[in-house]
Amino acid sequence: FFFLGDFNEIEIQNVLESFGFKGREGDVKVQYCQPYSNILQEGMIRKNVGQSIVELGYHCPSEYGDEQHLPMIVMNGLLGGFAHSKLFTNVRENAGLAYTISSQLDLFSGLLRMYAGIDRENRNQARKMMNNQLIDLKKGYFTEFELEQTKEMIRRSLLLSQDNQGSLIERAYQNSLLGKSSADFKSWIEKLEQVDKDAICRAANNVKLQAIYFMEGIE
């Protein structure tokens, strides 16, 4: 149990003891990484909706807390984590191929996911251009300004999380499962500042396309 805020510890303890819970020991596995396969998985379904969806799933060998953790986070920020990212700027704004678009990184499951809401006739063009944004990161095709802008957005997100009860409890829960303690804000920022272009390119080159999903809207 995790409690946060202004409360009476004795009252809380008495309530918990009244439940009769007993401690359990178990091997909780919080990290899952599906082995990479040379076979690209593809799936498609049709739904009676107006907008279509294309998703690209990438195998990401990094784990929470390892040396690739921060480079992967910055790489994802450059790719599609923010409004200035490559997916939003190039695929949505410049090419006009998507209504919504983003990328998400889950280091607990080793998955990098790109998502876009599109018109069905733009399926192949959007998919190719989305993948090309990652290829550009692998080649180092991004500016120092874009890198610093991404780091600043990550810093702001972290700062905001310091005042968010849900984020604080989530961090405490992760630390209890992983047996690690959170680095303080200053230490985390110092490590973030050390992430350079080479580190991001290495991280991006470790990411490989594993699956493609298309939901075709047929309204």
Q: Residue spans of the language-model regions?
A:
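His/Glu-based metal-binding/catalytic segments typifying zinc-dependent metallopeptidases
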Residues: G26-K86, M215
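M16/MPP (pitrilysin/insulinase) zinc-metallopeptidase core fold and M16-derived inactive scaffolds
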Residues: L78-G96, F108
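Short, conserved, surface-exposed binding loops centered on an aromatic residue
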Residues: I45-N48, N90, S103-D106
